[in-house]
C-alpha cells in the first residue's frame, strides 16, 4: 500500500520488499555471528593468558584439563618414533612441520609433545633431523589440541613408518594407532613445549584465529552493508506524488 509523505510517495513492490527483508536479516545475522566470534576469541585469549597462572603436575591418571593449562611432568622423550605434521607455517608464512614427539611419563603412560616448528627442506623427501637426546627430564608446557583441518574428505589411510612419519592433520587416535600405545594421559591431546625449554624448535605459541578486533571490523562491515541496503531500498522506492486527479500509478507502468 503506497504511503504518502508530503510531496513524495513510498510505494515498494511486494517482491522487492520481501527480498530486501531477507537480505537485511542475513546481513545482520552475519554481523552478530562475527561479534560472537570476537567474544569467543577474547575468551580464548584470556584462557591462554590465565593458563600460566598455575602449573599442574600431570600423570597417566590426570583428568582432561582446560586448554592452555600450564603443566609439568617428569619422564623421557621417545626420539625414535616421531611425527611431522605437514602443511604448518611459521609466523612469517614459511612452510614447514610441527615436530610431535611421544613423551613417556614417569610412572607409566604417554603424552604427545609439540616441540615446535621446523622449515621444509629442499624437497618433501628431505625430512628434517629432529632427534632429541635420551634420558629423564622435566617437561614444561601448555595443554592444547592437535591442529585440525578445516575440511576433511573421506577416510584416510593409517599412518605407517618409517619414522619420522609425515602426516597432514593427524588425529590423536591415528598417532596412537601408529605407535601401538594404549596408555595415554587424558590431560590433553598434546603439550606445547614452553619456549624456554631445551630440545625444541621455533615456538611462537598463541591462541589461534584472528584478533577479536578483526571480527569486530567484519561485523561492522556486515552491519554497514545492511544499512546501505536499507537506504537503497527506501531511495529507489520513493517517487514524487502525482498531481491531484492524476493516476498515482502512471509512473510505474
Where are these regions (language model features)?
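Surface-exposed, charge/polar-rich loops and edge strands
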Residues: 2-62, 69-253
Amino acid at each position: 500500500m503506497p504511503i504518502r509523505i508530503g510531496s513524495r510517495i513510498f510505494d515498494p513492490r511486494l517482491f522487492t520488499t520481501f527480498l530486501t527483508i531477507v537480505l537485511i536479516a542475513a546481513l545482520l545475522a552475519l554481523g552478530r555471528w562475527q561479534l560472537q566470534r570476537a567474544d569467543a576469541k577474547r575468551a580464548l585469549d584470556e584462557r591462554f593468558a590465565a593458563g600460566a597462572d598455575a602449573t599442574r603436575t600431570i600423570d597417566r591418571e590426570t583428568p582432561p584439563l582446560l586448554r592452555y593449562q600450564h603443566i609439568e611432568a617428569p619422564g623421557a622423550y621417545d626420539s625414535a618414533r616421531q611425527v611431522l605434521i605437514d602443511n604448518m607455517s611459521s609466523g612469517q608464512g614459511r612452510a614447514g612441520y610441527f615436530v610431535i614427539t611421544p613423551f613417556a611419563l614417569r610412572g607409566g603412560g604417554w603424552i604427545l609433545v609439540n616441540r615446535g616448528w621446523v622449515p621444509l627442506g629442499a624437497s618433501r623427501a628431505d625430512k628434517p633431523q629432529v632427534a632429541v637426546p635420551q634420558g629423564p627430564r622435566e617437561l614444561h608446557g601448555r595443554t592444547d589440541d592437535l591442529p585440525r583441518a578445516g575440511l576433511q574428505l573421506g577416510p584416510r589411510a593409517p599412518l605407517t613408518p618409517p619414522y619420522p612419519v609425515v602426516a597432514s592433520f593427524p588425529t590423536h587416535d591415528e598417532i596412537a594407532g601408529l605407535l601401538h600405545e594404549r596408555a595415554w594421559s587424558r590431560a590433553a591431546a598434546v603439550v606445547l613445549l614452553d619456549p624456554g625449554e631445551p630440545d625444541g624448535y621455533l615456538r611462537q605459541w598463541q591462541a589461534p584465529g584472528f584478533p577479536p578486533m578483526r571480527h569486530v571490523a567484519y561485523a561492522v562491515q556486515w552491519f554497514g552493508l545492511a544499512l546501505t541496503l536499507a537506504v537503497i531500498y527506501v531511495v529507489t522506492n520513493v517517487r514524487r506524488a502525482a498531481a491531484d486527479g492524476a493516476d498515482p500509478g502512471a509512473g510505474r507502468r
